[in-house]
């Protein structure tokens, strides 16, 4: 993973091109990402940059984390994130990055935690087809049906698609276009939708695929 930015999903809107074409965009607010630690191969076994963003009241920060932030001379943020880089020595503790890291037209990958939908059945969770609505069928309209065979193998195979918890997992959307960068307000406008609910943390990195 290359160096990226941590932002917060604000919601969706649309903007118009000069030709009058409507483009759906997701607005991501990017507050300054401040470097709290630089990890190197010699000391930590790998090269990485640890950053924080946002604000957290000092009364909500425990002593170990307060010491960690104080060592970096950085105000406590709402969390810590890490980006692996090729040359960590190029970065300094206390430096910061903002939305100007990206430019309009650039392709980016976006990671977030999808909306949790609780315990769901096979029809909604795995797009199973429903059974007959009539013709003698009762109580089994949305049942997923058989889950295995007989005495052999005598068990249900792992990863069998069944009802269960849906959502609330890490999701990556690749190669989204940066439509606009509002450096003054710290906003990134990304084409299309991104995972997660409004207010959720989003990680934006340069696209892996061209």
Swiss-Prot record:
Protein modification = Methylated by PrmB.
Give the top-rank taxon of the lineage listed in the UniProt record for this protein. Bacteria
Report a single Gene Ontology molecular function.
rRNA binding
UniProt cross-references to Pfam families, sorted A to Z? Ribosomal_L3
Report the GO terms under cellular component: cytosolic large ribosomal subunit
List where this protein forms a coiled coil: none
Q: Which InterPro entries match?
A: Ribosomal_uL3, Ribosomal_uL3_bac/org-type, Ribosomal_uL3_CS, Transl_B-barrel_sf
> Per its UniProt record, what PROSITE patterns does this chain match?
RIBOSOMAL_L3
**Annotated spans, Disordered:** 133-152
Q: What keyword terms does UniProt attach to this protein? A: Methylation, Ribonucleoprotein, Ribosomal protein, RNA-binding, rRNA-binding
Q: Which GO terms describe its biological process?
A: translation
* Positions bearing N5-methylglutamine: 151
Keyword RNA-binding present in the record's keywords: the answer is yes
The family assignment reads: Belongs to the universal ribosomal protein uL3 family.
Q: What does this protein do?
A: One of the primary rRNA binding proteins, it binds directly near the 3'-end of the 23S rRNA, where it nucleates assembly of the 50S subunit.
Q: Which PANTHER family match?
A: 50S RIBOSOMAL PROTEIN L3 (PTHR11229), LARGE RIBOSOMAL SUBUNIT PROTEIN UL3C (PTHR11229:SF16)
Q: How does it assemble?
A: Part of the 50S ribosomal subunit. Forms a cluster with proteins L14 and L19.
**What's the protein called, per UniProt?**
Large ribosomal subunit protein uL3
This protein's encoding gene? rplC
